[in-house]
Amino acid sequence: MEIPAPEPEKTALSSQDPALSLKENLEDISGWGLPEARSKESVSFKDVAVDFTQEEWGQLDSPQRALYRDVMLENYQNLLALGPPLHKPDVISHLERGEEPWSMQREVPRGPCPEWELKAVPSQQQGICKEEPAQEPIMERPLGGAQAWGRQAGALQRSQAAPWAPAPAMVWDVPVEEFPLRCPLFAQQRVPEGGPLLDTRKNVQATEGRTKAPARLCAGENASTPSEPEKFPQVRRQRGAGAGEGEFVCGECGKAFRQSSSLTLHRRWHSREKAYKCDECGKAFTWSTNLLEHRRIHTGEKPFFCGECGKAFSCHSSLNVHQRIHTGERPYKCSACEKAFSCSSLLSMHLRVHTGEKPYRCGECGKAFNQRTHLTRHHRIHTGEKPYQCGSCGKAFTCHSSLTVHEKIHSGDKPFKCSDCEKAFNSRSRLTLHQRTHTGEKPFKCADCGKGFSCHAYLLVHRRIHSGEKPFKCNECGKAFSSHAYLIVHRRIHTGEKPFDCSQCWKAFSCHSSLIVHQRIHTGEKPYKCSECGRAFSQNHCLIKHQKIHSGEKSFKCEKCGEMFNWSSHLTEHQRLHSEGKPLAIQFNKHLLSTYYVPGSLLGAGDAGLRDVDPIDALDVAKLLCVVPPRAGRNFSLGSKPRN
């Protein structure tokens, strides 16, 4: 395998803007490790590695750190493909353990840079590699700036090596004018603008036929010849380049890169190339590091532990996100609503709420979602899959979060407590929903009628009133409902199930809301009060009916005669007058009959012809007699309303 060497200008970091230099350096290493047809040289892991100090590491954000980790590990895997290493680099060990790479950097003395010697090299020896015992795995890579090797050049050698300095793996004959020199010992240091330069004039022997010029070596920077700045056009171009400039442009998205290898790496995201495949399940990944993390799912390995609660994770990035729960840190803020998030992926998903973007579409029904997990969960409606099963009762669920909430029913755990009324809940979402009863907040508005709701699910059910959609059908009787909850309650009519028992009188109910209303009989609670007269009611619909007395509203109209009624039950009774087709004199309003008729009074009149009539149904008795005996002196004719 062949990988391109970083271009010479990439090895020199600008000291004018440390943050920009770090970003550029990090972007550049993402291009290493891809093939290009150039001349070759041997390369060790150090040649494709970039280290950071603790201060520099702190300037990188999470995506940049993740990119650094992915590229470093992938480059190491590429080196391994050519043969087993003598030892694993420390930075790789730290990255695999999820540790920060700056923590392993050794201290480097701040003394004078070890001397370098430039010697004349015969033309026939140019470009010849002088091998020394290698201490790291090496491989062939194309060399940037190949044209330099065809010219008269000097040889770069270390004349004196400090006892604590690591031995280099390779030594090359380098053209002094064309290739900036770099001290490998101080490669990781950063020297500010105007930093001290070390004069190495005594170690420079001019090449025959060239003007002598002192080479000045900056600690941690590249050697250059100040008297001949034009000898380093590549460095000058790199430092003078703007932040948005680039030579290689992506045809898909227009993003520009300084190296063609960086562009090749970027194209993976468009092509979705997944070269790394799991042997267990066959799932493929774009990066080798993603495959390593995925394998921990099969092995169950969770090497990263939270120091606060002891929770373990298979991925270090997951641990970092988790630790923000303890610290309360939320560094990712939405510019539209100022809502903050602990993870950049959560912010990306949240932004789709504002944009309305729903990129994930169901192939079965065409429904679209703004999150892939929502689409995966939706697919289970079509397949009927419920992979998450409760170990206590065996009940299965389509998503893991529902199982987690359900398990708290068995454990009795209710960790989320309302600060207003001290009521506790087993999930944060239910607490949030409950708190809106105190604040009166109804953030979800219907676009058709403007009605507000405290929960998005309630709004979805309400919208079906306007659309007439009833997607939930009973298999027993074929009746359809707009909500799945209504269907569940309806099914109990067929099964006779009444799972909600009153603890006071042991009366059972098929739905929980009916139990709550019933319990108000025992407690005497009447939470719904009329603002006009102060009368209180135990149920909200009773208050709504009562308020029509004050407003005079009659919203129910008879289609036959146009008469208006304030209650739907009154309209239903009125419509019987039209449907039965009998004389008005023998039609009786069931409500009025039950109000003015005293059961048993007809049979008590001594009429022998009516002794076999069942006295339970007062309406049938009245139809037979066509007479309603008055109460205590009240007289009114048949078919007329009683006088007040």
UniProtKB/Swiss-Prot annotation:
Q: In which tissues is it expressed?
A: Highly expressed in the fetal brain.
Superkingdom of source? Eukaryota
User: Cross-link of type Glycyl lysine isopeptide (Lys-Gly) (interchain with G-Cter in SUMO2): positions?
Assistant: 582
Q: Name one GO molecular function term.
A: RNA polymerase II cis-regulatory region sequence-specific DNA binding
A GO biological process held by the record = regulation of DNA-templated transcription
What sequence ranges are listed for the domain KRAB? 43-114
Pfam short name (any one): zf-C2H2
Q: Name one GO cellular component term.
A: nucleus
Q: Which UniProt keywords apply?
A: DNA-binding, Isopeptide bond, Metal-binding, Nucleus, Repeat, RNA-binding, Transcription, Transcription regulation, Ubl conjugation, Zinc, Zinc-finger
Question: Which residue stretches are annotated zinc finger (C2H2-type)?
Answer: 248-270, 276-298, 304-326, 332-354, 360-382, 388-410, 416-438, 444-466, 472-494, 500-522, 528-550, 556-578
Where found in the cell?
Nucleus
**Key word Transcription present:** yes
Task performed by this protein:
May play a role in RNA metabolism.
Q: Which family does it belong to?
A: Belongs to the krueppel C2H2-type zinc-finger protein family.
User: Which protein, by its recorded name, is this?
Assistant: Zinc finger protein 74
Encoding gene, per UniProt annotation: ZNF74
